[in-house]
Amino acid sequence: MCIRDSISLKHAIHSVHFPHDAEELRQARRRLAFEDALMLTIVLQMLRQERGRERGIAFETGGVRNEFIAQLPFELTPAQCSVMDELEHDMSAPRAMNRLIQGDVGSGKTVLAMYAMYIAMKNGRQSVLMVPTEILAEQHYVQLQRYFGNKCALLTGKTTQKERIRILNGIRSGEIIAVTGTHALIQSNVEFNNVGLVVTDEQHRFGVHQRALLSQKAESPDVLIMSATPIPRTLSLILYGDLEISVVNGMPLGRKPILTRLVPLQKRVSMYRYIETVSYTHL
């Protein structure tokens, strides 16, 4: 849209309420849509510039990748290696990283988050991975144990009081170098020692306030976001325009493709039966 070919903003505001005809209403809506898009673009650019001025942590990444890969029981895909390059570039820079990793379920995003957390550990920094559900936190904890041994922890609403005290003391002292959990991580009694990296998985399921509280528990930490939700490129620029975006567009060997089905309302009962059958089959 060329602004020179459109009506003025004042004219558009009046015409959207009192149009003379359908064409004038169309032009008014088009002009207001342009105004919204322009304001959003300006705000996102201001956020990007502001974050670019923030002093972050310049992590040392030399040799870390080979050490990390040596522990993997599988080979990485070209897409994963490409994202690793981007992570190393961001984390070694003196400004704070703000990156979104987007990819289908099973594309290998988790190992990339583990790699970023591993870089933080090798630099003597803590890292935290917040997820929306306890089941997902438990799954990530299994992965953390592979790379961090007894220096990692799981903190959720189900954590017993005795275990919670042990974990909180370990986080505060720096003995625990990597922790994953749910919103329990942002409670006021959780005090980190030296956080360098904050990771959120499926961040759209957290409120803005929750994500801000987590990031505020450290001073200018690197931020990594993961999402398996398919987001069109244009929409991602609106939702994450202030972030750098990495796309894991390949699947590891042997992984089944992700199939999406639209089920009409009248076939909902059949869908439930199918889900139940599949669930029992994989128990």
Predicted features along the sequence, with ranges:
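Conserved small/polar residues in nucleotide/adenosyl-binding loops
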Residues: 1-5, 281-282
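Upstream accessory/linker segments immediately N-terminal to the RecA-like ATPase cores of bacterial MutS
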Residues: 4-72
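N-terminal alpha-helical segment
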Residues: 9, 64, 83, 148-151, ...
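Hydrophobic face of alpha-helices
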Residues: 35-38, 65, 69, 84, ...
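Generic, well-ordered alpha-helical scaffold segments in large soluble proteins
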Residues: 40, 44-47, 71, 86-90, ...
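Conserved pre-motif I regulatory segment
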Residues: 62-99
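Inter-lobe coupling/hinge segments of SF2-like helicase ATPases
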Residues: 98-283
